[in-house]
């Protein structure tokens, strides 16, 4: 008797259909959220090619000697790569320190020329009793973690 009554009872028929509909809508919403999430960021690699201080010759690497205490114009050439050693285009590079600053954007080959001094930035000041100045390099690009090196370039003061 109860089995027949249970078979004819249609009051709870909507419950499984509602659950199926909610499950489908939830899956569609989850798929949409996963499609919106951007791919993970990558690390940048930065090479400092050379450093030039005022009228002195260009020095390969990240260390240069400075003669005497004064304001100096500094030019630094860098190259920016991704994790596969491909050049990164349109990365913003900033070099600061010693009261000077310089900015540039990388070109198609990943090169940037940072000039501290003159019209595009202020000069680096080295005081009489100061032995060295460290310049901070920050590189930012879309889709990459920011690269930051507090001691990217070292300028060492010499007497002559």
What label would you give each PLM region?
Residues 1-11:
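N-terminal leader/signal peptides at the extreme start of proteins
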Residues 9-36:
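N-terminal single-pass transmembrane signal-anchor helix
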Residues 37-56:
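Proline/serine/threonine-rich low-complexity linkers at boundaries of modular beta-sandwich domains
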Residues 61-85:
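Beta-strand-rich structural segments
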Residues 71-73, 92-104:
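Short amphipathic beta-strand segments in non-cytosolic proteins
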Residues 104-122:
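Glycine-centered loop-to-beta-strand initiation motif
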Residues 122-145:
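Short, aromatic- and glycine-rich surface loops/edge beta-strands on solvent-exposed regions
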Residues 142-158:
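Edge beta-strands of extracellular beta-sandwich domains
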């Amino acid at each position: 008797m109860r089995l027949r009554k249970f078979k004819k009872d249609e009051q709870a028929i909507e419950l499984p259909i509602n659950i199926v509909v909610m499950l489908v809508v939830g899956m569609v919403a989850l798929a949409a959220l996963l499609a919106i999430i951007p791919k993970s960021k990558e690390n940048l690699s930065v090479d400092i090619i050379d450093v030039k201080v005022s009228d002195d010759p260009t020095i390969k690497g990240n260390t240069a000697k400075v003669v005497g205490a004064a304001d100096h114009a500094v030019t630094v050439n860098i190259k920016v790569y991704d994790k596969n050693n491909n050049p990164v285009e349109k990365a913003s590079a900033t070099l600061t320190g010693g009261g000077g600053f310089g900015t540039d954007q990388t070109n198609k080959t990943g090169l940037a020329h940072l000039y501290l001094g003159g019209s595009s930035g202020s000069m680096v000041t080295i005081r009489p009793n100061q032995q060295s100045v460290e310049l901070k390099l920050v590189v930012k690009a879309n889709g990459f973690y920011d690269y930051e090196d507090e001691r990217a370039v070292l300028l060492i003061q010499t007497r002559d």
